[in-house]
A protein has these predicted regions:
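Conserved glycine-centered short motifs in functionally critical loops
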Residues: 2-101
């Protein structure tokens, strides 16, 4: 990946998780995913790093025109988010109707 062992591992994990958060939020918007969303991040032991990641996620979610709420992070580094459904997700919009045959 982009980050290697030149820095300490906790700093590397934080950077990777922040990049993952950016991409996850972009994909959620692109695919118009709604409902309860769980994101599994690399384990971080530092409470400070967890807060930095949550702050970044809340900032990213705030940029979404659809109401998106970052709920919490569990001890397993799973982040729960909710996103309001305003229209069908992308996969439903482009799916062909099933035939009756």
């Amino acid at each position: 990946g982009k980050y290697s062992g030149k820095k300490n591992s906790s700093e590397t994990y934080l950077k990777i998780n922040i990049e993952a958060a950016k991409e996850a939020c972009a994909q959620i918007r692109l695919r118009n995913i709604s409902g309860i969303i769980i994101i599994d991040f690399i384990d971080m032991e530092s409470e400070s790093d967890r807060h930095k990641l949550m702050d970044e996620l809340k900032l990213l979610a705030g940029k979404d025109p659809v109401k998106t709420t970052v709920v919490d992070m569990t001890s397993l580094n799973l982040v729960e988010m909710t996103r309001k459904k305003v229209r069908k997700p992308l996969y439903e919009q482009i799916s062909l109707p099933k035939s009756d045959n």
